[in-house]
Amino acid sequence: MEDSGYMARAAFIMDKIMHKIGLHGKSFIPLVMGFGCNVPAIMATRTIESRSSRLITILINPFISCSARIPIYILLVGTFFPQYASLVFIGLYLFGIIVAVITAKLMRRFFFKVDETPFVMELPPYRMPTAKATFRHMWNKAEQYLRKMGGVILVASVIVWFLSYYPRPKASYERELTPHEQMEQQSNSYLGKIGQAVTPLVEPLGFNWKVTTSLLSGTAAKELVVSTLGVLYSESDADETISLSQKISQPNPVTGIPDFTPLVALSFMVFVLLYFPCIASVIAVAKEAGSWKWGAFTVLYNCLLYTSPSPRDT
């Protein structure tokens, strides 16, 4: 679409609508790019001449559901909302867009009241993208994703596994632990201690320490949320035949209550949509906005935005 010249015309067509929410026509392209990844989308705001419109576009971009959140949605929607999968999936995307629009209007009203920059944009001619250029873009995007998967995500997954596996009780070297002992070992692991320390902050939302720990790992990359849940719910080799979706919906052997219910799952997905952006996004916000205060603002605003009552209390 970029090579064909359509994206520039899309920005021109959307200018009137974008102005109604306090943005610029050129803000449309970075927001659309945010559905792929927020980091290049934030960097794409460099084309916006207006300082205020550029800042608003940068700050609302993390509310756009990037592709890294899709595995989380697929896992929970497929497990708890199979009959309404399309409705819930689309609803999450629309909710993120609505939050972004409301945030943009609030920022335009209270922080950035003046924007007199006219819309000036060169419209390139329509042209048919060549196969060579298309495959080059595909290769570059695939290479970036594989580097991310094989680099940050792989290393982080190994670290998460190590922190959840150690320290080991002496009995584990002599025999296979019982389900109760496995739960106790995970609870006393390094990762368990970290998760339990943070759990009181999100416990009203219905999240236990395993869920909280997956959210903490998601600050490095949202792809890590599902892999962390997979590590924490892999209690023994005998469980390898049981899928993660089955494990999270089964009753907890200690409490007798499932860690995830439909309401907790919905709350979790909305929380993932709104909470702390990945570290790469925060760095991109600070770099493109020109100050770390905007990176800190993004973290605080996104974390404080989710104030719904606990699903277990409804």
Predicted regions located by residue number:
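Extended, low-charge hydrophobic alpha-helical regions
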Residues: I21, I42-R54, W161-N302
